[in-house]
Amino acid sequence: NIGILTYYRVANFGANLQAVSTYYYLKNNGYNFVYLYESDDTVKNFQKKQANEIQKEEHVHFVDTVIPNQSFVFNANDINRAINEYNLDAIIIGSDAVLQHHPIRARIKKGKRKPFYIEKMVSERIFPNCFWGCGISEKISMAMMSVSSQNSEYKYFGKKLSRKMSETLSRMK
């Protein structure tokens, strides 16, 4: 039994197609699985700004039609509950740009009305979060598949942060 933690119910063709191809691979190879979709009101509000509603609805309708096994989770506690509820043996994290981190220094932007402002960011784009495996039970095996840290400005990562990220990633098997 495998849980797939990814960000696929979005207006993004790549995320949709990765989720669907993973679905068919697991289904055709006899695995039992459930998609764990992490979302909260902050993410929903952010998504509304990113795509028009009709396009987003079509993307979500597409993946909901193809992928029947879905569980909505909002934090690590929900993921740990899903591990028990679905008797999961492992979790696959990914794919797509789920390993992002945008430190505050990278989010300082030149403003039009003010000299500068700090760009808001949803929690899923700041380390630590569940996509890095943070807060998920140590008892379960986890692996990452086709993940990226797209648009993360590494030059702003300090040594302590980089070390903590490395420790977190070492849990993956």
Segments and roles (model prediction):
Residues 1:
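Glycine-rich phosphate/diphosphate-binding loops that line cofactor/substrate pockets in enzymes
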Residues 4-13, 17-169:
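Aromatic- and Gly/Pro-rich donor/ligand-binding loops
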Residues 172-173:
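A short beta-strand/loop micro-motif in the catalytic core of glycosyltransferases
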